[in-house]
Amino acid sequence: MVHTTVYGLAYLFYSGINCILLYQLEIESKFYIRYQLIMRVQKETTDAFTLQLASKEVITSSIYNTFNNTNEHMYLQPICNRIFLMTSIIDIASFKAQVLFLNIFMIK
């Protein structure tokens, strides 16, 4: 009886630790994926502005092409919505202001 209780408690403790570690790993991987996504979006946006192709359609299609073969499609719609907002509010010629705006809205 005592052995069963000890083994049961040890198993529960071990299971709890594993759940916590897996949850932490999941959270860290989501943040890492989000960070990588932000970096790639910034690069694509920078490239588009550098080539002076700063229209909503060009930036959006550029981002869609970047993530075409990945599993990150669920992140694309909010990003595109933010870019639409960014390009409609801020002057397209102001490159630095748009990148700053993108940084502020993407990190939240």
From Swiss-Prot:
It is a multi-pass membrane protein. The chain crosses the membrane at residues 5-27, 83-105. It is found in: Membrane. GO terms for cellular component: membrane. Keywords: Membrane, Transmembrane, Transmembrane helix. The keyword Transmembrane applies. This is Uncharacterized protein C27.05.
